[in-house]
Amino acid sequence: MAESKKYQIEARAVPQFIADQSDPANERYVFAYTIRFENVGTVPAQLISRHWVITDGKARVQEVRGLGVVGQQPLLKPGETFEYTSGCQIDTPVGTMRGSFQMTAEDGTQFEAVTGEFTLSIPRVLH
C-alpha cells in the first residue's frame, strides 16, 4: 500500500451559528463547529495537537494552537471515527476557519490531518 494511504485521517467540519450567545449590536458572533475524524488509513494514529486559523470578514486573523481537542487526544484505529464540538467568536457576521491536526501513528510517524476552509455565517447572509 502507498505510504500516503497508510497515514490518512479525514477531518470534516459542520459549522453552526449560535444566536443566543451572539450579540450583533456589539459585534459578537458566536459559532459552534463539529469536527468528525475518520481513520481511512491502515495504521492506528493519535491526535496530538491542533492549529486553527480563524479569519473574520475584515480579514483579521486569530490563530489557535493547543494540545488535543476538548481536552482529549483520541487514538483512532483504522475505520474508527471521533467527533467533537467546540466554538469560536468573531466580530463580523461572516468569516472562515481552517485547521490542521498533528497526528502520530502507532509506528511513530507524524503526519497532519487537515480540515479544509469552511465558512462561518449567520443565517440568510450568504446566498
Where do the PLM segments sit?
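Intrinsically disordered, low-complexity Pro/Gly/Ser/Thr-rich segments with frequent PxxP/GP/PP motifs
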Residues: 62-94
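Terminal connector regions
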Residues: 2-4, 89-127
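Short acidic, flexible loop segments centered on an aromatic residue
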Residues: 43-62, 103
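Low-complexity, acidic Ser/Thr/Pro/Gly-rich terminal tails and inter-domain linkers that flank the onset
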Residues: 1-28
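Short, solvent-exposed loop/turn segments enriched in Ser/Thr/Gly
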Residues: 28-34, 98
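Detector for glycine-centered tight turns/loop "hinges" at secondary-structure junctions
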Residues: 8, 42, 59, 108-110
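Short, surface-exposed linear segments at secondary-structure transitions and domain or protein termini
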Residues: 56-59, 71-81, 120-127
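Asparagine-centered strand-capping/turn motif at beta-strand->loop junctions
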Residues: 37-41
